[in-house]
Amino acid sequence: MHVAIIGSGPAGFYTAEALLKEIPGVRVDIIDRLPTPYGLIRAGVAPDHQSIKAVDRRYAATAAADGVRFVGHVSIGSDVSMAELQQLYDAVVLATGAPHDRQLGVPGEDLPGVLGSAAFVGWYNGHPDFADLDVPLGHPGACVVGNGNVAIDVARILAKTPEELGTSDITKHSRDVLNLSRVTDIHLIGRRGPYQASFTPKEMGELGHLTRAQPLVDPAHLPPVDNDAALEPGLRKTVTHLRAFAATPPAGKPITVTFDFLTRPVRVEAVGEHLRLIVERTRLDGDVAVGTGELRGIDCGLIVSCIGYRSSPIEGAAFDDRAGRFANDDGLITAGLYAAGWARRGPSGTIGTNRPDGFGIAARIAAEVTPGGKAGGAGLDALLAARGVRATCFADWQRIDAAEIAAARPGSPREKLVRHDHLLAAGCAPGTPSL
């Protein structure tokens, strides 16, 4: 049986791993538009969270297994169509993640200086699409909209010293910009309260140990402490951190990270050379945030929206535009076509959540798909060669990996290559012309 998996992030690799266990003799091609594998492990997980990135060793073992190929630098739609893949493979799995930001939905969000978290995180993590992103850090104010871990990551990266980022794999171009940052007043804006936030304890706790930044919480935003006992353990730990922040006196640190709970963005205004985010105070009606009509403005140079992600539609695959993911019935889109991970369920859960997801899809393929003598990878190779597409393989990635590690500054695991041509040049085997 020949299976194509579109997307080389956690969902793609867990699905490939499961297919090897479920279907003897299966041949799996993991296809990605980037020259490099690992998806959000490489380009989404915060650069100062290296222990989380270590899961790529498991994926590398899958990529090196007999019957699995990584096929990078191939775009679905322009290099090969979905219809062609379905002709070549017995089953196709969409594991493309959710690479696009959800819109704030407020006037002025298209102004320069308003960024989505996918762009901002991609910028400091070395995603080639965002190597030239303009990140304005010349104003003291920065607003981060959202009450989840991505918002915490963004605030933490803005607040850390160069020394604190020294052991990370943050990119050189973003280090250079961050080192000149004038940001001193970071606002974390959430429309609901602490009990409704999606922060996890580890990420929250890190904010309390930054060299030059102090987290600030208005005690009035915290529910009565006796109510904490009814919370699930993780949320209770998070709220305990927030209570500690609220009780800590000012320490004279040059940067503050203010948690603006019960606050929602209304519009963005251009004021001279900077921005003003107009926000409305909210109140809770149950767990629903309701506007009070009380407005105020926060002056800033940068606004980063961290309110969720959407998958990218692919011609030939039914898409649920409202949910921002592929339309599917427990992973099945149509006969022989499946979705896994965020492409199936939307952006939820942890990296590990994708493992049972991938194993479930593999079990469905084993039960539902009959091998049809299709060409599989050999057919894809012939098609790409005829079109002049130079795909990367896992050996190419290993050369890129080695080049990045060799270029690392002291204390850092690697210096990422961030442009397609540099990645392709580094990945070429000796004697192979680069693009």
Where are these regions (language model features)?
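Glycine/Thr-rich phosphate-binding loops of Rossmann-like dinucleotide-binding domains
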Residues: 102-103, 124, 196, 313-314, ...
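N-terminal Rossmann-like dinucleotide/flavin-binding domain of flavoprotein oxidoreductases
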Residues: 34-91, 237-254, 258
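Glycine-rich dinucleotide-binding loop and its adjacent helix/turn
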Residues: 101-180, 321-331
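Rossmann-like nucleotide/phosphate-binding core characteristic of flavoprotein oxidoreductases
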Residues: 1-6, 10, 17-29, 44-46, ...
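Glycine-rich FAD pyrophosphate-binding loop
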Residues: 23-39, 164-165, 169, 173-174, ...
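Feature captures the FAD/FMN-dependent oxidoreductase FAD-binding
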Residues: 59-114, 266-278
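Conserved Rossmann-like nucleotide-cofactor binding loop
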Residues: 11, 36, 150, 194
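Dinucleotide-binding/catalytic capping subdomain of oxidoreductase cores
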Residues: 156-290, 369-373
